[in-house]
């Protein structure tokens, strides 16, 4: 039996085809849920490192350790050779976005509450979701989820002004991550995760000039280095891989709308792990978000 051929000309082995089939039976919303949970576990580890390492060093450790994992796991450079000029430009752009986005995010949370940074980050996803809300039903879903997130997050306009600069920069870069991430997820074949890994290697190189110096103290303390690796796995490997698996089967607008569930996950995790019980306003916000996501209906991915 001949092996199935990819657009790149590489063959899909029966084992790889079987793995794809098993993943295809998992609802894309499940991958999104995994990404959402680890979206908040990673920053919790990173905050602990801020007391021992420079913020830029923590950001570099996150990207670099994720790049090492992808290099050992996927050997992503194999996917770069067959790419055309456009595909390589996309990888370079995504790598640059990942490097600067992760840096801007940590510079923001070092100066502002995490909830404020997260709420500002959601503004970009609202724009992407609105661009794809082509039906009254989906427009209503967008209104419900936006109102729900506003009720949950309660942005406080306090903190260092520079923190807001970094937070809005992170917001813009997160939008680009979604756009570019969808592009590589929908280029055909099973190589989306490999292309993501290649972009992460580019990100690690790009962030080295401003991040390596701040990370050097960790190389003399194995516990710090291990914690940095944990941040990379929890913040960049698991959630970004899960994003790729979800993006390959969800339109950009639907994926953006589902990001409204991130504050819901944060509230639930806070209640279970930290005993931070939600207020009546939190419960109302969660209800609106869940109703909005349930109301939304997937549309053909014409915006891609």
Name the predicted role of every residue range.
Residues 1-37, 66-93, 134-140, 157-159, ...:
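Membrane-interface interhelical linkers
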Residues 1-60, 96, 100-104, 147-150, ...:
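Glycine-/small-residue-enriched transmembrane alpha-helix faces in small-molecule transporters
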Residues 2-18, 63, 260-304:
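C-terminal-most transmembrane helix of multi-pass membrane proteins
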Residues 34-41, 45, 73, 92-107, ...:
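Hydrophobic alpha-helical transmembrane segments of multi-pass membrane transport proteins
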Residues 57-67, 98, 105-134, 170, ...:
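Specific alpha-helical transmembrane segments that line the substrate/conduction pathway
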Residues 61, 117-123, 181-204, 236-272:
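Helix-helix packing/entry segments at the starts of transmembrane helices
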Residues 70, 128-129, 145-147, 152, ...:
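Transmembrane alpha-helical segments that form core, pore/gating elements
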Residues 123, 130, 137-156, 170, ...:
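Hydrophobic transmembrane alpha-helices of multi-pass small-molecule transport proteins
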């Amino acid at each position: 039996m001949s092996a199935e051929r990819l657009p790149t000309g590489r063959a899909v082995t029966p084992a790889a085809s079987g793995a794809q089939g098993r993943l295809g039976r998992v609802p894309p919303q499940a991958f999104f849920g995994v990404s959402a949970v680890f979206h908040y576990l990673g920053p919790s580890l990173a905050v602990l490192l801020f007391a021992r390492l420079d913020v830029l060093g923590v950001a570099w450790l996150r990207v670099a350790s994720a790049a090492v994992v992808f290099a050992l796991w996927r050997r992503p450079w194999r996917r770069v050779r067959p790419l055309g000029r456009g595909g390589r430009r996309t990888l370079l752009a995504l790598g640059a976005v990942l490097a600067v986005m992760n840096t801007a995010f940590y510079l923001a949370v070092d100066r502002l509450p995490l909830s404020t940074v997260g709420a500002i980050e959601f503004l970009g996803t609202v724009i992407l979701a609105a661009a794809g809300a082509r039906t009254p039903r989906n427009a209503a879903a967008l209104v419900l989820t936006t109102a729900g997130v506003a009720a949950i997050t309660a942005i406080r306009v306090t903190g260092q002004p520079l923190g807001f600069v970094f937070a809005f920069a992170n917001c813009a870069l997160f939008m680009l991550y979604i756009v570019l991430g969808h592009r590589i997820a929908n280029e055909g074949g099973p190589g989306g995760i490999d292309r993501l890994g290649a972009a992460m290697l580019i990100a690690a190189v790009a962030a080295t000039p401003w991040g390596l110096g701040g990370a050097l103290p960790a190389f003399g303390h194995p516990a710090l280095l291990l914690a940095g690796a944990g941040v990379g796995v929890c913040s960049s490997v698991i959630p970004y891989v899960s994003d790729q698996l979800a993006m390959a089967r969800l339109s950009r607008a639907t994926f953006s709308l589902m990001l409204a569930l991130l504050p819901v996950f944060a509230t639930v995790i806070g209640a279970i792990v930290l005993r931070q019980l939600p207020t009546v306003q939190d419960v109302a916000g969660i209800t609106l978000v869940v109703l909005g996501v349930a109301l939304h209906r997937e549309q053909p991915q014409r915006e891609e």
